[in-house]
């Protein structure tokens, strides 16, 4: 059992207790914290509260996180949006809210559970039992194209392409504010945040080099629709880089200074639109694009109507 305490800051005031904790610990779901709250493993100012309690500035929230237990990852019949498939690779369009592989608080309903059911025993095993077939990841609330490897040979090949930065990865996203330049590049090494352990940050001393190219697709009142091309693939790269220049992604509570005015929006507006790579067996260049999810299309329409 691990116990930690957090002081509520001004920009976090008004959040539900379960949501506040899921922001602090993005690897755990709100349902996970609702169970902890119900079992009185969460307190506010040393007093148990309901999950619906809205935290106040200077509240001290204390949580007891149970020790991780080993679990068997089971195949689950979860529908997949498949963009391409052959004997070596599978390209899927990951939906919003789906974690790529099991982790503490997310032992089921992950992409790994889904691909284990779909592919049976034909998945690479290089990343172990928890991450079969997984050669790269995108965040839980980021949607879009992702490569799954169906054998170890394909996995080694694709992993090398990623290491050499030769995989073409194009994202689209909506950021807060009006980006002045039509295009540009953000360069800044990314590492763990020195204080908030769940966040990444620009860290030139201890971080890894990261480069993000961007292009403005459309401007709205107070928001900008953008395209991003990654040279590197660091954790939360686009989210950290855009926040570092004053334009956090719409809906990204972790890296913005306040809550989104769009109450229905859960998580950042970021979509892995296109992925291109050399096929590990044929040597041919392949490129696939995932259509924008419905929530993203609706958000664009809403922003256009308010311009």
Stretches found by the model and what they are:
Residues 1-185, 191, 295-303:
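RNA pseudouridine synthases
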Residues 50-54, 227, 267:
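Short, surface-exposed secondary-structure edge patches
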Residues 82, 175, 214-216, 249:
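Conserved hydrophobic positions within beta-strands
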Residues 92, 240, 251:
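Active-site flanking residues adjacent to catalytic metal/cofactor-binding acidic residues
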Residues 128-160, 168, 172, 187, ...:
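The conserved catalytic core of RNA pseudouridine synthases
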Residues 159-161, 249-252:
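Catalytic Cys-His active-site segments of thiol-dependent hydrolases/isopeptidases
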Residues 201, 250-264:
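Short, surface-exposed loop/helix-turn segments at secondary-structure junctions
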């Amino acid at each position: 059992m691990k116990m930690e305490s957090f002081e509520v800051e001004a920009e976090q005031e008004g959040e539900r207790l379960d949501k506040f904790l899921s922001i602090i610990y993005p690897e755990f779901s709100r349902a996970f914290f609702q169970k902890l709250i119900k079992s009185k493993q969460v307190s506010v100012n040393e007093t148990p509260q309901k999950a619906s309690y809205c935290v106040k500035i200077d509240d001290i929230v204390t949580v007891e996180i149970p020790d991780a237990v080993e679990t068997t990852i089971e195949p689950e019949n979860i529908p997949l949006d498949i963009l391409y498939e052959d004997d070596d690779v599978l390209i899927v369009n990951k939906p919003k809210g789906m974690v790529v592989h099991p982790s503490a608080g997310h032992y089921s309903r992950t992409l790994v559970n889904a691909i284990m059911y779909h592919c049976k025993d034909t998945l690479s095993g290089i990343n172990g039992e928890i991450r079969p077939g997984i050669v790269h990841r995108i965040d839980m609330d980021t949607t879009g194209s992702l490569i799954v490897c169906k054998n170890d040979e394909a996995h080694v090949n694709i992993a090398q392409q990623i290491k050499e930065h030769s995989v073409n990865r194009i994202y689209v996203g909506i950021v807060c504010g009006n980006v002045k330049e039509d295009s540009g590049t953000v360069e800044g090494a990314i590492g763990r945040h020195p204080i908030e352990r769940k966040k990444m940050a620009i860290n030139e001393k201890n971080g890894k080099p990261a480069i993000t190219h961007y292009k403005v697709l459309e401007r709205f009142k107070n928001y900008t629709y953008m395209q991003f091309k990654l040279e590197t693939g660091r954790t939360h790269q686009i989210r950290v880089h855009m926040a570092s220049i004053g334009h956090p992604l719409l809906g990204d509570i972790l890296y913005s200074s306040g809550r989104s005015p769009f109450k229905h929006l859960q998580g950042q507006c970021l979509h892995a639109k296109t992925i291109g790579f050399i096929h590990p067996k044929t040597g041919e260049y392949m490129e696939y694009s995932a259509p924008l999810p419905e929530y993203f299309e609706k958000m664009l329409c809403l922003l256009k109507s308010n311009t």
